[in-house]
Curated annotation (Swiss-Prot):
UniProt keyword terms in alphabetical order: Chloroplast, Plastid, Ribonucleoprotein, Ribosomal protein, RNA-binding, rRNA-binding
PANTHER family: 30S RIBOSOMAL PROTEIN S18 (PTHR13479), SMALL RIBOSOMAL SUBUNIT PROTEIN BS18M (PTHR13479:SF40)
InterPro entries the record matches: Ribosomal_bS18, Ribosomal_bS18_CS, Ribosomal_bS18_sf
Cellular localization per UniProt: Plastid, Chloroplast
Encoding gene (name): rps18
Family: Belongs to the bacterial ribosomal protein bS18 family.
Name the UniProt record assigns to this protein: Small ribosomal subunit protein bS18c
HAMAP family assigned: Ribosomal_bS18
Species this protein is from: Manihot esculenta (Cassava)
GO molecular function terms attached to this record: rRNA binding; structural constituent of ribosome
Keyword match Ribosomal protein: yes
Transport listed as a keyword: no
GO biological process, one term: translation
Quaternary data: Part of the 30S ribosomal subunit.
Principal subcellular localisation of the protein: plastid
């Protein structure tokens, strides 16, 4: 086999398939806080489907459950744990 054809052959590396984030026994519900909290960012935002690796139906159910939990006050709308310091930009820094 000449050198130009050898470049196109890929080595057969074994890879480990990732487990789905939601198992078949997991119940998507607004009361299941341990499940819901895995799909929320540090700022309290709902993570995208690409980041979560969920199917469309699962992402829709997770989104509805998160919104219900927010309305019922079991989950905050925003995570305000980080307090940002205001930095003045300009001539005078006090």
């Amino acid at each position: 086999m000449d050198k130009s054809k050898r470049l196109f052959l890929k080595s057969k590396r074994s890879f480990r398939r990732r487990l789905p984030p939601i198992q078949s026994g997991d119940r998507i519900d607004y009361r299941n806080m341990s499940l819901i909290s895995r799909f929320i960012s540090e700022q309290g935002k709902i993570l995208s489907r690409r980041v979560n690796r969920l199917s469309l139906k699962q992402q829709r159910l997770i989104t509805i459950a998160i919104k219900q939990a927010r309305i019922l006050s079991s989950l905050p709308f925003l995570n305000n744990e980080k307090q940002f310091e205001k930095k003045r930009v300009g001539r005078y820094n006090y």
